[in-house]
Amino acid sequence: MRNQTFIIVGAGQAGAMAAATLRQQQFDGDIILIGKEYHAPYERPILSKEYLINPEEAPKYLFSEDFYLKNQIDLRIGQSVSQIMPSKHCVVLENGGKLRYDKLLLTMGARARRFPLLDQLGENIYTLRTLDDAQRLRQAVKKDKRILIVGGGVIGLELAATSCELGANVTVIEQADNIMGRCAPPLLQDYLLNRHQEKGVQFFLDTRIVSAQKQGSELVLILNTGEKVIGDIIIYGIGAEFRDQLAADAGLVTNGGIVIDSRCQTSEPDIFAAGDVCLQREPLTGDLQRRETWENANRQATIAAHAMMGLAPPQPGAPWFWTDQWGINIQMVGNMQAEEWHVQGDLQSDKAILFGTENEVLVGAVAINQGREMRNLRKLLANPMVVPA
């Protein structure tokens, strides 16, 4: 019986972790890991923080070069797949080469959503999604630079804190009337907004950019309020575009991402997907959900690897992620849209836990500088419990 070949398209967090999991689970066939970037798989969370702050900070690779050799993982960086042919169990590379697979895993992730109004300004306009992006930003963010950050999500706020720590003057422009609106409860939004403002970050909330101009070396944004903001650099983070076109062209079910089931299987039985590129149905509501987090990429990679081998997948825990801003570690687990939130501890001292409940059932929690407590909270949220009145 010939060896099976498993191909993984996308050499990021999910792709590399899936390859590692396959070997951990004793898969003895061929593994081919194909990545478009000219870098071995690396950790992305540090790109908006330590990597920018410390010029000596090296990229943090997921595994050493020896790891891929020792585990016989055929890592092919700087290569792309241009077509999937499900009926032939074959992928076509951009250079015209073809590779046959028994199982295929798609982990292409996402790219930064473009903002043409800003892109047309030319130089000194940045996004942050990749190591190459971070290397460019590292050269640009300097002391006394006026930095305009468009987008008040997690990455925008981390960049605001990092830029301030480097001595820059920072302004954040956000279209919504709050920050981190998609992933933080109101108590946490207000707390973080106050911390940033105390450090000198200026905010324009509930505000749109209606015009963007370049005047000499200055970048000028006109807001819908009529106000004008001027900067030397613009960094924008307004969401992501998910790399699902390859899957859609192959006839897989997509909906602004590749639709997968609880086993990370797509509409094609021998094709699986994991990470940011995916949409998965929530067990309780049936709604399609995407979780763009480091933890979710690892979790789905593990589930997909087990499913590809025909093994029972591990039980998923409650969704968890974290952010570090101003030296404050904030970890979130479970449902951040809970109906009610309760505070234990003192937010003013930057040490507290927020509990989110629905009908007196604990459904979410936020730990602020309480990493040890978060370990217990993650276990609790794996099995929601009634909170005593």
Where are the language model's segments positioned?
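Mid-to-C-terminal Rossmann-like scaffold of FAD/NAD(P)H-dependent oxidoreductases
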Residues: R2-T5, A11, Q24, V277-E373
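Conserved beta-strand-loop-beta-strand element in the redox core of flavoprotein oxidoreductases
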Residues: M85-L99, Q213-K228
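FAD-site-proximal beta/loop scaffold in flavoenzymes
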Residues: L121-D144, V220-I222, E227-I303
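Rossmann-like dinucleotide-binding cores of NAD(P)H-dependent redox enzymes
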Residues: I155-S211, T293, P316-Q325
